[in-house]
């Protein structure tokens, strides 16, 4: 499928000036400023160039690629965010990428360095952030990532401390649902140490269909009181009932509150069914409880070495209502409780023993570490992660109607009695459990391989190993299905950035800055074979405030191990609209993995243009074109 997207985005940005002057040029740690004021006031004086030595903001990304957006402390405060998660959500229009498969999380950096994962810093308060930088996809290559996501760099303040407790309660205007959240966060940041601990407790009540006035009949003839359907010629319930009603009666609601209804009472409900709505026994939102603890510790061992550790645990419980147990019986004409004189069908729901439901409990434990070390002009980063996700799900199946059906057929059980079905028991529930474990270790080496008059040749080498383990077991109707999948992924990639011309050297003073980049990598999957990835890009900056970029990327992707082997779950009584028949139905929906899935190949073409006009303050214009195959 070919998808072409053309977008022109107006972005408001805030610059951090080095000096209160108009034209600023940054190369490495040198800022060159043309003194226009001298030229204006003294035309006979030869123009002079003032060289001001300055340092980059500590923690900024060392790249010549201009950021898409920068936020200072005032900009961050204006977002009204309470965590870094809120900030990422607020800058999503600038941070999301149109490349690749879309929908992925931007790459997150902290002080210009890789982290083990977003959870390492997501609970930091926004007040601890000095600046936020958003970079285009090309910068991802510098850190060993694919160029299909943009990069967000959070720059921390050198010294910060806080202890915050937050309570939130949310209720919709129409009621019926409430969500409570309690969170406490401790943060300590110094020049060489960072500590953050966050504890969060969330509770939410269930929201049923009836609380939103939804009718969930699903085209069913089942009803709490019961409905009668005919089995005779032309679907007739009873010729005698036809005579009383004056028409052919094919369906009739059971008179409510009557233990021995007669034909005259059924005539009052002729060709009218009892209400089959069971919205009070079906949830739109489940009842949920969640406890999460997240902690991070980081320390700089000297100016060139940083170690970070993170641990996270989350417990989540859900309870969903899936409707009422129900079935259809054949009520024989010979039954002493039947007034019809011939066989009919009785269809009804039962409030006892209780609604069908699904209970789910999930335990998630994650830990990660990051080691950053400078080796001369090179930066070596090692990240490691382990995640364990254990889930247990129990789904109530329908009730066991065997004894009840036998009693109705034998004529010993009154199907219209108030206590009909009071002693029902559920069939054995469906059980599903899964244990998903992921381990990964990745090493990245990035630095300057060669210094040229036009600029530095940058190389990035990345190697990684990932092991995924999925074990699942499903028990349904007495049949047990076990799935055990393993996947090892050894991957390597290299990226090179080569400056062709420099603005202050040779031809570059006339035609501007030109640079090219390229990357190639492969992954060897134990259960899927070898997958390749590649990319190349061209960058042209004819002026300091105008940049054009063109790039092509391609890769091969395998289905996730969960997509192949997740346990199958059957969810009963899911309201579904049949477009062919034009009616709503209750159906059983099966979800889970499919071991027959095949791989995917993708190719992207990307064109970008960025312009920051000098005559409009805090204004940027970005043009992007994507073509995805």
Per-region residue spans from a language model:
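Surface-exposed, low-complexity loop segments enriched in small/polar and acidic residues
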Residues: 108, 207, 211-222, 254-288, ...
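A beta-strand signature from Gram-negative outer-membrane beta-barrel systems
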Residues: 115, 124-166, 208
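Transmembrane beta-barrel strands of outer-membrane/channel proteins
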Residues: 165-171, 182-184, 197-203, 309-315, ...
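Non-catalytic regulatory/gating segments with a bias toward low-complexity or hydrophobic composition
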Residues: 76, 88, 132-133, 152-154, ...
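N-terminal periplasmic "start-of-domain" segments of outer-membrane beta-barrel proteins
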Residues: 24, 46-79, 104-109, 163
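Extracytoplasmic beta-strand/coil segments of soluble accessory domains associated
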Residues: 27-28, 36, 40, 53, ...
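Short strand-turn segments of transmembrane beta-barrel domains in outer membranes
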Residues: 133, 151, 160-187, 197, ...
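Outer-membrane beta-barrel proteins
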Residues: 156-158, 171, 184-192, 296-303, ...
